Design a protein with these regions (language model features):
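An internal, D/E-rich "acidic patch" concept
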Residues: 58-114
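Hydrophobic alpha-helical transmembrane segments of multi-pass integral membrane proteins
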Residues: 17-22, 103-107, 150-151, 287
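Membrane-water interface segments at the C-terminal ends of transmembrane alpha-helices
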Residues: 22-29, 66-70, 134-165, 187-192
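Residue-level recognition of pore/gate-forming positions within transmembrane alpha-helices
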Residues: 12, 20, 42, 110, ...
Length: 313
């Protein structure tokens, strides 16, 4: 087991390295002169040269990349062009809102999606199954920002039940913190719930058709015992896999959701950086999100043995 973990960790290094090189190269792939674009129309030649030097555009690509990668390994993601503050500091200041939104969405999505997927498979062809499938198709088809505006209009404007925008830190109270996250989590979590529920249903249908499940029924076991101890346990690996893959949906959805609900998180920081062409921030955020995605899927791979002891490393 330990040897497998070490090999997988070593295998992630070139993946993250390639991602880092691609992220760093974005600046050089930008059409035109990035320094002139950032400086604006009224900038002087000296201003453009200063920005070019700050971005390292006056140096060859590979030497600049090695210098940047070495700094990243020491926790230095560069300096923001517009605020002149370290990118690491700017990201660190916005971790809590993004982490709160992502964790709330993930937990609620799993707690809702897995049960309704199991029930839909158990009652295949019935009304509940059709409703779950209808929700899955609709939830996966509606863009996050469209659903967000619908929820804002319904629950914040018409019913006046929930606040529209902003974020309240957890230290100011659990309910104020949670109240600000309900609408964003609903908007972001719907597509995630739809995905997990659909995969759970499909996997459970396949497992419920197996001989050992029919044998468990023949022995007179309670339906709940058959579902939980025999069917769901053996369907866990594909479900856990799609939960890990769905982290990409969370990462991309966070950017849109934070922009709509004016949450001062990493997603909102990314949008502002894109608008202002603050490349060091864009590079730092993309590298951070890519690394998180790789590590989450590594953790998912390592967790398979917990759900299926037959898997050997």
């Amino acid at each position: 087991m330990l040897g497998y973990v070490v090999r997988r960790l070593l295998a992630t290094i070139p993946v993250i390295g390639m991602v880092a090189f691609f992220v760093f190269s974005l600046l050089y792939l930008t059409p035109g002169d990035p320094a002139a674009v950032i400086a604006g129309d009224i900038a002087t030649v000296e201003d453009i040269e200063r920005i070019r030097h700050t971005l390292g555009l006056d140096q060859p690509l590979l030497p600049r990349f090695w210098a940047w990668a070495s700094a990243v390994l020491h926790g230095d993601l560069g300096i923001s062009i517009f605020t002149n503050l370290p990118v690491t500091q700017l990201i660190g200041q916005r971790v809590e809102p993004t982490l709160s939104l992502a964790l709330c969405t993930l937990i609620v999505a799993v707690l809702i999606a897995v049960p309704i997927g199991v029930i839909a498979a158990w009652r295949a062809g019935k009304l509940i199954d059709r409703l779950v499938m209808l929700f899955s198709v609709a939830g996966f088809s509606i863009p996050v920002f469209v659903l967000a505006y619908v929820l804002i209009y319904l629950f914040a404007i018409e019913l006046d039940w929930l606040p529209v925008q902003g974020y309240t830190p957890l230290r100011e109270g659990v309910w104020p913190w949670l109240r600000r996250l309900i609408l964003p989590s609903m908007a972001l979590g719907t597509i995630y719930i739809a995905l997990i529920a659909r995969i759970t249903r499909a996997t459970m249908l396949e497992v419920l058709a197996q001989d050992y499940v029919r044998t468990a029924h023949a022995k007179g076991l309670a339906p709940s015992a058959v579902l939980m101890r025999h069917a769901l346990k053996n369907a866990a690996v594909p479900i856990v896999t799609i939960i890990g893959i769905g982290v990409a949906l969370l990462i991309s959805g966070v950017v849109v959701t934070e922009s709509v609900f004016a949450i001062p998180g990493i997603g909102r920081l990314t949008v502002d950086a894109i608008i202002r062409r603050d490349y060091p921030i864009i590079q730092g955020v993309i590298l951070l999100f890519s690394t998180i995605y790789v590590l989450v899927n590594l953790a998912v791979d390592l967790s398979y043995r917990l759900f299926d002891p037959r898997i050997q490393y």
